[in-house]
Each structure stands twice: as structure tokens, then as C-alpha cells.
């Protein structure tokens, strides 16, 4: 294994991403940001096809995988996640959106807010993305500035509806494509957007003092070195030599020791909350750790099957169910990075739950999950998101 370049932490690190309706320009904007910042020596220009390159992409013409690019502004280092736009692939948005300290909501001025605009705002709210900046894209294609004003008002109203400060949220107008093509004015708007992101999205208070927890997103083997689990550190810190537990999906807790750590393909001394890292685990076989489990500080989190939850059930126009559900309903609960089937028991006096309801009920999972009070999840059936919520009380 060749000596890796060492990742040096000099600027505060922030995770952001692009969200919004399919074809409104999320990936084009991501490419434009890297291109404009590259001219200042703060990024490597990534072209659209690089960011958009996911094997499934070519077959169906829709973005499926979550792309991560990195860049810097004068003030910060960013990891930027390009959230998939298509409703069928909201599953990846769920793993992705959970990775954001703030989001850039991309809305095409030619269209205004669309169903997935609403869906992504809702998901951002549910997975704890507290700061959104708006980029009104394709403004060059709208002749009447009053129409753009109208779209901006609609977007602000929609954000307010989901408890964001719609009146105060910064809105930048521009054209990602023109910026990508080198138009000076369009590029200035991209710089303005990044200045606003720098200022409006606060440097997150990292949860570095809490016990280490990292949901496992991917597992792979490095020949001759062992098994690597990768994901975003949820809280705490990790370094080589630390003892960790692999928790979830099975009753038995597996213990291991961290023997290597890297980020952005560079070795890392200390991984901390918010970092996307690969953790090399001693004495663990490739099949002993799977997506959906968590790596955790010993004794810090247990597995549970039964809990109480506060849940928002999506309305039909948000892509949710058309009909109510009752006790004994058995959907999938998407925790951390995986689906687990669970049975719902409604509280006494509640006969059914309607789309659009905000409700509380008890869940019994068929497999143990590494959860605690405050753990967020989404509810899915047949591949579509029908609800979102969080654990309010552990019952077993």
C-alpha cells in the first residue's frame, strides 16, 4: 500500500449538500461550485459527469448514488454531498441527508417548487438539517424578473411550512450552467452563494465530547491489512489503538481495536464527529460487520427491539400513503443505514393513523437495532418513504 498523503486539519470542517427536485440543477451547481473555487486554488474542478458517475445512472438516466466532493472557501473546508433527486431513490437521500450540517436547496426559476422540493425539505427537517440556503437556478431562462420574485415567495412559504425561517433564509439567484461555461456574472453569483454558505450555515458544534458512534455505510477488505468499515462519525472521536464495539442487527456484540484510519484517501490521526472516515478493524472478518450496524465506544450503546416513537406520516402529495394504517401494520424502519421490519402498535384510543398525521406509537422490530432516545429513522414500504420520526423512549 503506497504511502498516503496526510490530511491536515487547518480550517473548520462543514458537511453540506445539494437538495431539490430532479433536473433542477443540483449536480450542475455542485460542478459549478468546484469549478469556480478551483480558479482560486481552493478546489479540484469536478465536471458534471464525474459527480454524476454512478453505474446505475447510465442505465436509467437518474442519479442514484450519493456523490461526495471536497473543496475549500477562504474560511472553511467542505465535504459536499450531491443528494439524489429522484423519489424512487430517496433511500440514498436518507443516508445522505443525515450527513449534512446545512443544505443548498436548488429550485429552478423556470419551474418553481415541485413535489420533490417539498419532499426534500421535509426530509431535511426530519433528519436534523437545521440550515438551508436557497439557490434559484436557471434564472437566465426567465425573462420576467417578477416571475422570479414569485418563485422566491413560493419557496419561502414552503420553507416556513416546514418550520424553517422562510422569511430570513438567504436566496441567491443565478445560473449554474452559465457559471460552468465561464460566464463571469454567473460565476460571481456562485461566489456570492459560497460567501453566504460560509456565513449563514454555522460551523456545527461537533459532538466530539460524547462517546464515539459511527453508523457503518460500507465494508470492504484491504488485502493484507484487514477489514475496513466506512461511514460518517456521528459523535465522539476515534484514533488508532481505540477499542470499539460493532453493535446492531445481531444480539452478540463484537469487540475490536482500530488499527488504521483514513479520510479522503489520506491517513488521519484522529477522526471526529462529522468526518467521513474508513476505520481498519483488527481481527474482524469481512462478513462480521455489515451496513446498518454501528461502531461505538465500548458500552455506550445497546441493541433494542421495542421503543416508543414520535412520527410524522407523509401526506399523499408528499409521496406518502393514500390510505390510513392500523395497529399490526408492518413496514420497514430505516435506522442509520439499513431497513428493519417492525410491527406498529397504536396507543389506546387511536384507531388508525392518517397520512399527514403527527403521531406517537410503539414499534417492535424483528431484529435488534443500535438505538437510543433521539435516534431518528424513516418508515418505508415497497421502496417508498411513508413516514419519518424519532425514538422517544426505549421499552426493552
From Swiss-Prot:
The keyword Metal-binding applies. Residues 11-205 form the tr-type G domain. It is found in: Cytoplasm. Residues 137-140 are annotated as: G4. It is an enzyme of class 3 (hydrolase). It catalyses: GTP + H2O = GDP + phosphate + H(+). GO terms for molecular function: GTP binding; GTPase activity; translation elongation factor activity. GTP binds at residues 20-27, 82-86, 137-140. Residues 82-85 are annotated as: G3. Residues 61-65 are annotated as: G2. It comes from the Bacteria. GTP hydrolase that promotes the GTP-dependent binding of aminoacyl-tRNA to the A-site of ribosomes during protein biosynthesis. This is Elongation factor Tu.
Amino acid at each position: 500500500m503506497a504511502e498516503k498523503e496526510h490530511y491536515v486539519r487547518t480550517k473548520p470542517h462543514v458537511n453540506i449538500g445539494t437538495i431539490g427536485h430532479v433536473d433542477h440543477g443540483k449536480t450542475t451547481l455542485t460542478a459549478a461550485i468546484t469549478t469556480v473555487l478551483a480558479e482560486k486554488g481552493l478546489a479540484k474542478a469536478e465536471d458534471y459527469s464525474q459527480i454524476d458517475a454512478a453505474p446505475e445512472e447510465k442505465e436509467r438516466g437518474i442519479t442514484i448514488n450519493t456523490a461526495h466532493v471536497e473543496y475549500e472557501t477562504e474560511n472553511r473546508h467542505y465535504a459536499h454531498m450531491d443528494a439524489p433527486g429522484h423519489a424512487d431513490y430517496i433511500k440514498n437521500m436518507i443516508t445522505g441527508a443525515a450527513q449534512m450540517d446545512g443544505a443548498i436547496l436548488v429550485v429552478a426559476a423556470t419551474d418553481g417548487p415541485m413535489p420533490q422540493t417539498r419532499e426534500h425539505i421535509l426530509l431535511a427537517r426530519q433528519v436534523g438539517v437545521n440550515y438551508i440556503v436557497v439557490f434559484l437556478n436557471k434564472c437566465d431562462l426567465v425573462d420576467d424578473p417578477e416571475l422570479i420574485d414569485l418563485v422566491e415567495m413560493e419557496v419561502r412559504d414552503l420553507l416556513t411550512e416546514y418550520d424553517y425561517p422562510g422569511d430570513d433564509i438567504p436566496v441567491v439567484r443565478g445560473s449554474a450552467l452559465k457559471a460552468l461555461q465561464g460566464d463571469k456574472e454567473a460565476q460571481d453569483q456562485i461566489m456570492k452563494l459560497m460567501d453566504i454558505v460560509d456565513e449563514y450555515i454555522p460551523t456545527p458544534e461537533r459532538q466530539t465530547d460524547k462517546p464515539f458512534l459511527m453508523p457503518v455505510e460500507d465494508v470492504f477488505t484491504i488485502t493484507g491489512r484487514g477489514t475496513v468499515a466506512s461511514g460518517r462519525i456521528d459523535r465522539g472521536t476515534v484514533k488508532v489503538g481505540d477499542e470499539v464495539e460493532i453493535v446492531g442487527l445481531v444480539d452478540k456484540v463484537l469487540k475490536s481495536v482500530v488499527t488504521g484510519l483514513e479520510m479522503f484517501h489520506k491517513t488521519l490521526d484522529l477522526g471526529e464527529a462529522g468526518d467521513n472516515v474508513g476505520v481498519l478493524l483488527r481481527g474482524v472478518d469481512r462478513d462480521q460487520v455489515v451496513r446498518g450496524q454501528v461502531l461505538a465506544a465500548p458500552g455506550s450503546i445497546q441493541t433494542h427491539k421495542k421503543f416508543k416513537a414520535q412520527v410524522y406520516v407523509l401526506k399523499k402529495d408528499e409521496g406518502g400513503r393514500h390510505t390510513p394504517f392500523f395497529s399490526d401494520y408492518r413496514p420497514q424502519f430505516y435506522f442509520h443505514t439499513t431497513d428493519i421490519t417492525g410491527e406498529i402498535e397504536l396507543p389506546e384510543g387511536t384507531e388508525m393513523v392518517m397520512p399527514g398525521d403527527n403521531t406517537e406509537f410503539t414499534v417492535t422490530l424483528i431484529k435488534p437495532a443500535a438505538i437510543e432516545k433521539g435516534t431518528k429513522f424513516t418508515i418505508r414500504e415497497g421502496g417508498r418513504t411513508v413516514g419519518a420520526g424519532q425514538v422517544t423512549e426505549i421499552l426493552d
